[in-house]
């Protein structure tokens, strides 16, 4: 039975996000089908104290040569350039190319260099959206025939914690410049002055923009609780009047489908992968136009029939996505190389 080596080192960090959540859910789904799908799996975890780059490009290839799996899949963009078997790499987005100021010089250089080389050398490149696929092919000159689109799926476990009291709008994700939160806060403040009841909750780690956002909010009720665990995020989404996602760049937009699962209408930027993820189940705005952001939020909140329709469509859209389906599509990519 062929063995697939899966790099799972990002899955079990204390606060996983992005590729770590993807890896954890994919590994769980693959583990449940191991053997019955005709494949065995070797879940690799990083050990020791070697620098990350050394582990990726030296230690991991040694492990692969020792055990000789049929192929290796790295779900985090980082694929060993020298390997004894075919390689599959998942690319979630190229934000480090499109928004370089969001990354330190060292981190940005690492992601750009390793991801470019991995995408060009991999036998298959899995992209989480058609947008990311187009971006990878355009920026790195990757042959489209070597790419496959396999979308993400909702990953948050369902919980029963009580949502916060009162009415609020929610943003869930990192607080970074590319997330376009300043324009959203300004639009929300304008709505508050016009009588909007909802406060604004920005749930996520602050990467240097928090002070500016607080200043833009003035005396209006802006909450920034920082990193929120799965239980807390589930409760926040169930209680929100709407999820607003103003980002200028997303490779998929996990928060969108998480909100849809929980009956929370979504109001999204018409940018990058968000329209692909939201489809006809979301309301949209032009992300650089504060007036349009305010208009879209108000339109959803003031029209109960429209809001109910978005909730219904969102639940239907989210039901199309599951980790069982994502794993099955990923296995089909593996089979192309076996």
Q: Which residues does each predicted region cover?
A:
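Carbohydrate transferase catalytic cores enriched for Leloir-type hexosyltransferases
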Residues: 1-338
């Amino acid at each position: 039975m062929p063995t697939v080596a899966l790099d799972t080192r990002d899955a079990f960090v204390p606060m996983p996000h992005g590729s770590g959540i993807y890896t954890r859910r994919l590994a769980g789904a693959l583990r449940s089908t191991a053997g019955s799908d005709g494949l065995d799996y070797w879940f690799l975890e990083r050990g020791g104290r070697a620098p990350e780059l050394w582990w990726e490009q030296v230690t991991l290839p040694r492990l692969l040569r020792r055990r000789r799996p049929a192929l290796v899949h790295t779900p985090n963009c980082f694929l060993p350039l020298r390997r004894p078997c075919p390689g599959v790499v998942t690319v979630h987005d190229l934000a480090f190319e499109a928004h370089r100021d969001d990354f330190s010089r060292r981190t940005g250089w690492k992601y750009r260099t390793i991801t470019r080389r991995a995408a060009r050398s991999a036998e298959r490149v899995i992209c989480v959206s058609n947008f990311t696929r187009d971006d990878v092919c355009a920026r790195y000159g990757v042959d489209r025939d070597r790419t496959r689109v396999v979308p993400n799926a909702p990953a948050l476990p369902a919980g029963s914690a009580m949502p916060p009291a009162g009415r609020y709008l929610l943003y869930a994700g990192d607080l970074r410049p590319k997330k376009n939160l300043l324009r959203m806060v300004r639009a929300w403040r304008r709505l508050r002055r016009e009588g909007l009841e909802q406060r604004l909750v920005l749930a996520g780690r602050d990467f240097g923009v928090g002070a500016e956002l607080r200043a833009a909010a003035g005396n209006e009720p802006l909450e920034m609780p920082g990193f929120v665990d799965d239980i807390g995020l589930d409760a926040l989404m169930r209680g929100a009047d709407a999820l607003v996602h103003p980002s200028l760049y997303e490779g998929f937009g996990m928060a969108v489908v998480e909100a849809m699962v929980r009956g929370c209408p979504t109001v999204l930027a018409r940018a990058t992968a968000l329209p692909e993820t939201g489809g006809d189940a979301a309301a949209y705005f032009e992300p650089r136009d504060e007036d349009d952001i305010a208009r879209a939020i108000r339109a959803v909140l003031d029209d109960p029939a429209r809001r109910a329709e978005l909730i219904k469509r969102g639940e239907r859209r989210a039901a199309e996505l599951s980790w069982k389906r994502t794993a099955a599509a990923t296995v089909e990519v593996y089979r192309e190389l076996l």
